[in-house]
Amino acid sequence: MKGKRSEAITQGFERAPHRALLMGTGIPRKELGKPLIGIATSFTDLIPGHIGMRDLERFIEKGVHTGGGYSFLFGIPGVCDGIAMGHKGMHYSLSTRELIADMVESIAEAHRLDGLVLLTNCDKITPGMLMAAARLDIPCIVVTAGPMLTGTGRGGRRYSFVTDTFEAMARYKAGEINAAELQQCEDRACPGAGSCQGLFTANTMAILTETLGMSLVGCGTALAVSSLKRQIAFASGERIVSLVREGITPRQILTREAFENAIRVDLALGGSSNTVLHLLSIAHEAEVDLPLDLFDKLSRETPQLASMNPGGKHFMEDLDAAGGVPGVLYQLRDQIHDNPTLNGVGVKQIIDSVIDVDETVIHPKEDAVRPEGGIAILTGNLTPDGAVVKQSGVSEKMMTFEGTARCFNSEEEAMQALMGGQVKAGDVVVIRYEGPKGGPGMREMLAPTATLMGLGLGDSVALITDGRFSGGTRGPCVGHVSPEAAVGGPIALVEDGDTIVLDIPSRRLEVKVSDQELAKRRERWQAPEPKIKKGWLSRYASVVTSANTGAVCKAR
């Protein structure tokens, strides 16, 4: 091991003040020569995905000390997208990804930590942590806190967050369930600690973190309440000290091949469309070229092998029992690169260690759920720079659709129309000025999409937006439309009554309006006033880039 970063604060007579401050925290002098490990914890008792982290912190600390290091905890904020959904709070969710990356960078650099254990779980926290790891390029290992168990009900019914709350709300509005049944859904949907039970954004990112090689084998699917999760936390603490001594850093792991592996696993499972944004942003920090169209190229080659909630019947506990990430890699083995991982072995060795895969959950290729992957990238005159659709959540009937535009300039306007019965079969709901700059913050449209499904319109109405969707979204919903409305993208020029064509097999999203007419509308179009003119979101809107490049922040 070459000279440690922490020697800048622990060695030499001129560092006497630094040592005094460190010993003021309780660290004995004899420990100052050990690798100093930061545990970036996003613990909060405000959200269920993170309430179990106090226990995991202890096991990580034990592992660090067993491995011969000395650990320090520092806090990182965490936002629950479910709680932030459908109101002003959702403006802040995506933007916290950048704050998290900046905060981890700031603490690690200011205190010259030798390595980091990144304790995370929910939607934007995991990509923010990975962005920081790639940017810093110091030894790092990620521990995701794990998924929640499904709720239980009579007759073996299994409850989960999205389908039994957001969609239940719309069913209640439609008179399909009564108030007592709605309350029962509320009571049973979230039985304890962990990220939401389906293949939503948090769990997809945990799986991709393991696939990338940035967490230990099994971490991506090990349940929050399991003893295995604690064992992984301990092993991760022990492993980070070895990574420091071996000089293994994230950019040695986060190669182009690692990202291709992650995309293929994402596609095979039908994961959240948000992963497109996040993988692009992590690759940006790792200085890896990852074009948007690569997702579509790989999707055409990679079959969907699992039917995961929200679009299917299986939950994270099923995937974990079926073989987890190694099981998926095994079924894709002829398409997977042998990339290094933080486990000390390559991906192929992990695949070779697989003993058994439950093929009723993780199908073999010859019995694929769909011939293509879960995500498709669309282009056309409505989205010249690309848009994203989670095709794994779209019914065969809606893979091609032609409908009449109903335009709304905010999520709130769209929800008012949906709940007021103003959206009918054959419509295409257009929600715009919700992009990274225009939102600002590119809000998730889970409430509108869940309402469409709950109202029984999932097979007769499409929704397109320059915003994004929850990992819990299902149905014919196209997001990340780029360029966004706030910068004059074509979605800003669509008018009520226009005909919109959605053709997922052909990867097209178009409005049936001539170029000449669009040019006339562009001449009349005026950029709206910013919705938020002060504070963090105002600054964020001024530096955030388009969704097709990951909505990363760049200097003015």
Curated annotation (Swiss-Prot):
The modification N6-carboxylysine is found at residue 124. The active site is at residue 470. Its EC number is 4.2.1.9. It is an enzyme of class 4 (lyase). Binds 1 [2Fe-2S] cluster per subunit. This cluster acts as a Lewis acid cofactor. [2Fe-2S] cluster binds at residues 122, 196. GO terms for molecular function: 2 iron, 2 sulfur cluster binding; dihydroxy-acid dehydratase activity; magnesium ion binding. This is Dihydroxy-acid dehydratase. The lineage of its organism: Bacteria, Pseudomonadati, Thermodesulfobacteriota, Desulfuromonadia, Desulfuromonadales.
